Amino acid sequence: MQKRILVLLLCVITSLTWSQKAHRHNAMSLSEIGFMVGGSYYIGDLNQQHFRHTNIAGQLLYRYNINARLAYRLNFTYGKIEGYDSEQKGAFYQNRNLSFQSDLFEFGSGIEVTYFPFEIGNRRYKGTAYLLAELSLTRINPVANYNGALVELQPLGTEGQGTELADRGKYSRVQLGVPLALGARLSLSPNIALNIEYGIRFMFTDYLDDVGGYRYADPTLLAAANGPTSAALSNRSLDGNRYGQRGNKATRDWYTFFGIGLMIRMGGKGSCPSDFR
């Protein structure tokens, strides 16, 4: 009796072990890791022209293929954005004379849907276009050149944020966004695919550039509340105007990431499980 129980336990343990190994193999074969290198730029108060001031950007990503048409995706993106009134067309912008630059650190998670079924290394599913929809958190830190040094703008409250001069507090340097992207994938080998993507990040803030669309704060009161540097960087207009609108609050800022890179299937050579299809 004891021998039978021992044999039964050994069978159960062996079965569970093989089941776990198969599950791990399936999860690995459905997973991909990769990278993309490309560019980033922003559209907002200090730049309305696409691809102007494009900076080098990069992305690390993980993809878990739910089936041949649907995948879950995680990605970390680094980019840089900037804008200068001095390079915009129009007397208003030239006179306003504001500028900024900011590093971006973005973490995003979402769903990717392919136009055609796709699997790396499968001759039947060699290439496809896809759509990506995500939610993201992005750390921003707009800075401006002042007296030969880069000065962080958010702590200064250049529109009177955080004082009695404004009805709002200082904006957060971590912002929520909605990345939407179009891309294409092409299988190059049993375990490697080419990835091309262009995406827009719709943001829930108008302060990527530290310009929120409100009127200029009184410079004397702003200097008393937030310091002389805040007042100096709040209004850099050539004619000293402080009665007009500082920016356009009817629209919010957004930025893009586009790139090309490679995806590598984890788990080695071979087709995905039959239920993947």
Regions found by a protein language model. Give the residues of each.
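Short glycine/proline- and aromatic-enriched beta-strand/turn motifs that initiate or cap beta-hairpins
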Residues: 20-65, 142, 253-269
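Structural signature of outer-membrane beta-barrel domains
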Residues: 40-42, 79-83, 116, 136-142, ...
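Repeated loop/turn-to-beta-strand initiation elements of outer-membrane beta-barrel proteins
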Residues: 69-72, 119, 191-194, 269-271
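Gram-negative (and chloroplast) outer-membrane scaffold detector with strong preference
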Residues: 70, 75-155
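Outer-membrane beta-barrel transmembrane domain signature
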Residues: 136-253
